[in-house]
Amino acid sequence: MCWPLLYPLVLGLSISLAEGIQTPSIYDDVESTRGSHEGPLGPTVELKEPKSSDKPNPRGYPGKFCANDSDTLELPASSQALLLGWVPTRLVPALYGLVVAVGLPANGLALWVLATRVPRLPSTILLMNLAVADLLLALVLPPRLAYHLRGQRWPFGEAACRVATAALYGHMYGSVLLLAAVSLDRYLALVHPLRARALRGQRLTTGLCLVAWLSAATLALPLTLHRQTFRLAGSDRMLCHDALPLTEQTSHWRPAFICLAVLGCFVPLLAMGLCYGATLRALAANGQRYSHALRLTALVLFSAVASFTPSNVLLVLHYSNPSPEAWGNLYGAYVPSLALSTLNSCVDPFIYYYVSHEFREKVRAMLCRQPEASSSSQASREAGSRGTAICSSTLL
């Protein structure tokens, strides 16, 4: 599971090493002194002399406006080769299609069961919000899927591009923040069970959910305030978010995406690591009694780190070195890594909900239209476990 998720990071580094000093400097007026030739990833041009190397490497494919046309961007040949290759036009839509096909029914059914068949405990509210975030993420992907399948042609207009891009990032990072909130709730329940009786209430749970949603909305807000669609020079392609003017890269996109990666991913993952680390120590201290819960907790932590770390590391690397030649076209590796990150919304239902035998029984009872009384004994047992440190399901 780890290798496919780390592949975009390895791809980004290989792109940089393969291009070396032959990568066209996207900030300079490139003059060819020896002509062009085919490189490992497409046409490359040998540079005569870069005029400057002190500008930051941008987040997306950076383009220059065509003369007397503010709607059209020119991209270097190497960037166009990555933008129109098989990865963004075949692999990425396949991953998005998998998220829609699996994430919609899995999260929709889980949300239905949580809302109708599970006692309304504080942990239930957190898991319901997580299911909503993952469900909404799957719902906003079809426009992006159509865009990539059409060969990077956005047919829905500027406003739809802004909303779709902001919704993609907002719901994905909202899921990360809610995962951190769930880890805090489980830490209190398992490590401090007596104190949890006073702390784990509706007020704390509601506050955590509000903070997660408001933070995600704030982090995604810049994506709705600036233009995102531009025509690719020499083609009929209307790009959505994949190519942005050079003049806008450092002014607002750089700080916006640095904040998105740090506050929306690295800080929540750090909180999850601390909470689940303490939880794992508490479970390990009890020996084999809670071995299943121990393995499940480790799986939850590994899934979050493996899903979100590669794409956000690539995002930060874009700004880590002021020299454009340092990392090359890392955005070509970032696009598939972002698609891999969305797969977490398919994994969440199975490691948080369906892994529980009690939850599967509730799903079966609902699908078979069994009366609610058939699962009342299980509901009473779950409600009675509110003050315990461990219960057999994931619904703490």
Curated annotation (Swiss-Prot):
The keyword Membrane applies. It is found in: Cell membrane. The chain crosses the membrane at residues 95-115, 121-141, 163-183, 204-224, 256-276, 296-316, 332-355. Its main location: membrane. Gene3D superfamilies: Rhodopsin 7-helix transmembrane proteins. Residues 28-62 are annotated as: Disordered. It comes from the Eukaryota. Highly expressed in the spleen. Slight expression in the heart, lung, skeletal muscle and kidney. No detectable expression in brain, liver or testis. Also detected in platelets. The record marks R59, G60 as: Cleavage. It is a multi-pass membrane protein. PROSITE patterns: G_PROTEIN_RECEP_F1_1, G_PROTEIN_RECEP_F1_2. Glycans are attached at N68. CDD domains: 7tmA_PAR4. Disulfide bonds join C161-C240. GO terms for cellular component: plasma membrane. Belongs to the G-protein coupled receptor 1 family. Receptor for activated thrombin or trypsin coupled to G proteins that stimulate phosphoinositide hydrolysis. May play a role in platelets activation. This is Proteinase-activated receptor 4. It comes from Mus musculus.
